[in-house]
């Protein structure tokens, strides 16, 4: 093997537009009958939206052998992601077509993501034994700005170490034993993080949690395989767990005088207040067995 360095760049853009109308019609416009549109204060509305996601990725990878048994891998990646949304909402009185711009129901925001990561890996191969540990570091910086509509500007930073390790052993010419561990992370979305106190309906209040951490899932796997002219056998065991899943938390305001939140926001007595927290826990275990028997040159049983 020889030393190798790889440089790569990728750009991706996904613009979308949406233009929709919602119109109410009175199918029985008899003057003597109930005008349902006026009775229920229904309004025609028009929504004109534009969204775009643009992502650029810069990456460098380097691999070098050390002697006949060892290999070192290292690299770095930078991702710049820009999400923009501009949704304009127009309302008309009753069933008319005289639409007027409603800023309170419109929204426009910019979401910038800077993701920096670096990794290092080592591989040892000796006869039938393979050992491969690795470690990746990720730093994520988010900036969210609301230009129109309800929302609160905020920044968030995440720092994560992501380890992995794998082992492989050849048990003779036709048998293999493998095991490993890896971690996966999920970062909270802007709606989970946004600290805006949404009390448009004062009895159902929603607020994000800017103190959320990345959700981490740990997985362990062990597998055995054997291949002969008559039988192919594969047995695998997998276990994964998560101790800090992002879940919705809701509670009733039980204080007769209501409750005051950070920023001076007040939730009245009896309101349902909802936010998010790293409170989720999950466990999953799976066992898989596969057998392929070549009973005869023309018969194969799975």
Task: Give the ranges of each region predicted by the language model.
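Membrane-embedded beta-strands of outer-membrane beta-barrel proteins
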Residues: 58-60, 118-120, 163-165, 210, ...
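Extracytoplasmic loops and strand-loop junctions of Gram-negative outer membrane beta-barrel proteins
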Residues: 37-46, 99-106, 115, 145-151, ...
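Outer-membrane beta-barrel strand-turn architecture
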Residues: 64-68, 123-128, 161, 169-173, ...
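Surface-exposed extracellular loop regions of Gram-negative outer-membrane beta-barrel proteins
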Residues: 141-143, 173-218, 239-269, 274
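Face-selective signature of the C-terminal outer-membrane beta-barrel domain
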Residues: 1-145, 235, 283-302
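Outer membrane beta-barrel strand-and-loop segments of large Gram-negative receptors
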Residues: 46, 55-59, 100-106, 213, ...
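Short secondary-structure boundary/capping segments
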Residues: 23-25, 91, 150, 194-197, ...
């Amino acid at each position: 093997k020889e030393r190798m360095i790889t440089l790569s760049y990728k750009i991706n853009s996904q613009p979308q537009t949406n233009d929709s109308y919602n119109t109410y019609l009175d199918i029985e416009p008899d003057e003597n009958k109930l005008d349902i549109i006026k009775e229920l204060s229904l309004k025609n509305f028009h929504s004109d939206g534009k969204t775009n996601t643009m992502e650029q990725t810069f990456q460098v990878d380097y691999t070098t052998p050390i002697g006949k048994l060892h290999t070192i891998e290292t690299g770095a990646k930078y991702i710049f992601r820009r999400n923009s949304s501009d949704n304009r909402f127009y309302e008309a009185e009753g069933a008319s077509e005289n639409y007027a711009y409603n800023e309170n129901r419109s929204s426009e925001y910019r979401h910038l993501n800077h993701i920096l990561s670096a990794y290092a890996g080592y591989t040892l191969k000796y006869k039938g034994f393979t050992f491969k540990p690795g470690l990746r570091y990720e730093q994520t910086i988010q900036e969210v700005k609301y230009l129109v509509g309800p929302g609160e500007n905020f920044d968030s930073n995440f720092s994560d170490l992501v380890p992995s390790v794998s082992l492989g052993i050849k048990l003779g010419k036709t048998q293999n034993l493998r095991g490993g561990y890896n971690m996966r992370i999920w970062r909270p979305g802007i709606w989970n993080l946004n600290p805006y106190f949404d009390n448009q309906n004062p009895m159902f209040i929603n607020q994000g949690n800017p103190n959320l951490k990345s959700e981490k899932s740990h997985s362990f796997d062990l597998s055995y395989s054997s291949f002969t002219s008559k039988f192919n056998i594969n047995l695998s065991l997998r276990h994964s767990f998560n101790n800090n899943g992002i879940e919705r938390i809701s509670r009733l305001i039980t204080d007769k005088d209501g409750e005051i939140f950070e920023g001076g926001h007040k939730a009245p007595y009896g309101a349902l207040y909802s936010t998010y927290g790293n409170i989720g826990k999950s466990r999953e275990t799976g066992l898989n067995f596969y057998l392929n028997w070549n009973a005869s040159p023309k018969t194969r049983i799975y």
